[in-house]
Structures are given as C-alpha cells and as structure tokens.
Amino acid sequence: MNLIPMVIEQTNRGERSYDIYSRLLKDRIIFIGTGINDDIANSVIAQMLFLESEDPDKDIHLYINSPGGHVHAGLAIYDTMQYIRSDVSTICVGMAASMGAVLLAAGNEGKRFCLPNSRIMLHQPMGGAQGQAADVEIHAREIMKTKERLNQILAHHTGQPVEQISKDTDRDFFMSSEEAQKYGVIDDVLKRPPENS
C-alpha cells in the first residue's frame, strides 16, 4: 500500500491540503525515494523544468534515497540536471546506490551532500539479453558503451581518473559518507541543512 502523507497549510483563504511532494516542491525540493524508472524520471524531469521556469537563479534541492534503477531513465535525469540553468544541490538521505549515486555526484560542485549515516554504492551497469546470438552480441556491446559512459561521467564529477572508476566499479563499491567525500562523490557531510535552504 502506497500512502502519501497530506499536509495542511493555513492561508488567508482558509485551509488547504497538499500531498507532501507538492508541498516540498513549493520549497524547490524534489525527492527520489524509490528505484529509478521511466515514470520516476519523467516526474523528476518535469519538476526540474517547472522549477527552472519559475526561477532559474534559485537552487533546486534533489534529495535521494534510492537503490538505483534503469540506467537510461537515470541518464535522462542526469542530462536534465546538466541542461537546466538552475543549480541542483543533491542530498543523500539513507542510500544512493548505482544510478542514485551517479545523480548524487552530478549535483553542482560545492552543493553535493549526504547525511552522516548515508551509504553510497557504485558499480557497473547490469543487463541481460536473450535471443539470437547476433542480438545478444549487439546488447553486450551496448552495455559496454554504457559502462564506459557512466565511468566518464563519474570521473568528471568526482575528479577520479577513469581507470580508477573502472577498477572500483567492477564490483559493488560501498562507501560511508566520509569515504564518499574523500572520493569526490559529495562535497560535505551535513549535520544541519545547508545555509541557503
């Protein structure tokens, strides 16, 4: 059962109730709290585009608690983060794994955070193919290209050499918040909200 909390806000016209995500959006907060698929990506992208159109000079705060998900859905969010004029601050609460970790690292420099007990996990993309041998070979080449692209993205945002990223992501690579800061995935471990929130 998926229960979305409602919040009630007093206005000069009386009470108004919002689902919690709509209320957070008013404060320029987007929350990814599940695996990343096309529906989640479309929702996050639409919210980013809306917030950019409202005020491109104000930061967007992307909170992440995600086990990862579909690479191409995640890359659609990533590309949007890089495309919009608003800075995107990323904050890991709980877990940022796989594509979630890529999005965490992709926040604007100096604005990537996690909470003290967060866990970050990097690894290579997973895939599977069946069918004719030629089709399986095509899919294998495609996943290798995707792996190389993700390694380049992580190298760009963390400052680590591509070779190091490739070595570390060969298997599941878990990090504490402090380790993620040293690695370059985040800029700081938060004990309180960022100043400009």
Swiss-Prot record:
EC number: 3.4.21.92
Origin: domain of life: Bacteria
GO CC terms, sorted: cytoplasm; endopeptidase Clp complex
Subcellular location: Cytoplasm
Transmembrane segment boundaries: none
Alphabetized InterPro entries for the sequence: ClpP, ClpP/crotonase-like_dom_sf, ClpP/TepA, ClpP_His_AS, ClpP_Ser_AS
Enzyme class: hydrolase
Any Pfam family matching the protein: CLP_protease
Entry-linked PANTHER family: ATP-DEPENDENT CLP PROTEASE PROTEOLYTIC SUBUNIT
Its biological purpose: Cleaves peptides in various proteins in a process that requires ATP hydrolysis. Has a chymotrypsin-like activity. Plays a major role in the degradation of misfolded proteins.
Subunit structure: Fourteen ClpP subunits assemble into 2 heptameric rings which stack back to back to give a disk-like structure with a central cavity, resembling the structure of eukaryotic proteasomes.
Descriptive protein name: ATP-dependent Clp protease proteolytic subunit
Source organism per UniProt: Natranaerobius thermophilus (strain ATCC BAA-1301 / DSM 18059 / JW/NM-WN-LF)
